[in-house]
Design a protein with these regions (language model features):
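Hydrophobic residues at beta-strand termini and immediately following loops
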Residues: 124
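N-terminal targeting sequences that direct proteins away from the cytosol to non-cytosolic compartments
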Residues: 4-72, 79-118, 127-132, 140-145, ...
Length: 176
């Protein structure tokens, strides 16, 4: 650069012009999440706004999940076999929200079926409007084990985050 400057400063009064190659401005590409691989034996694709967090040793993964009214907590745990019955698990979650237990028939009426990378799975919303607390829970059979994904937030947060929650659950696959 200095050499160019010195050569351009001659004694004559001629105007010199130089041409420099244009560099391309970086293109802002949309952020695409790639599947996260880890030592758990499972991979997933999480929404860009979710923040990995520390959880208990029982959790395969933990995320802070922002929504307009605050921050939700998402956990992924793995249990052998079925991890207990659907009725036992859902009623445990209901008790955590100070709600009465339900029969398996009542629970199954509220469950929604989905298909994802691990196959068929179920999601249930458990909401206690009086406490302003809610869970969105998925039960995903995975061979000889079951994954449980639970999002804890307020009822408004559950409704806001539900689409991302379903996408996350559907993205879960077994890593090889």
């Amino acid at each position: 650069m200095i050499l160019v400057f010195l050569q351009s400063c001659g004694q004559d009064n001629h105007i010199r012009t130089y041409q420099l190659a244009k560099t391309k401005a970086p293109v802002n590409k949309p952020r695409v999440e790639t599947p996260e691989k880890n030592s758990t034996g499972f991979s997933w694709t999480k929404p860009g706004s979710w923040i990995a967090s520390s959880g208990s040793s029982m959790r395969l993964a933990s995320f802070d999940v922002p929504f307009s009214g605050g921050m939700g907590d998402l956990s992924v745990i793995q249990l052998g076999g079925t991890g207990g019955s659907i009725e036992a698990n859902v009623n445990r979650w209901r008790r955590q929200l100070n709600l009465d237990s339900q029969s398996l028939f009542e629970i199954e009426k509220e469950m929604i079926d989905y298909k994802g990378g691990l196959g068929d799975y179920k999601i249930i919303r458990i909401i206690n409007e009086e406490l302003d607390s809610a869970f969105l829970c998925a039960i995903l059979p995975a061979g000889n084990q079951t994954l449980f994904v639970k999002l804890s937030a307020g009822p408004k947060g559950i409704r806001e985050i539900e689409t991302d929650f379903i996408s996350f659950c559907s993205s879960l696959i077994i890593s090889i």
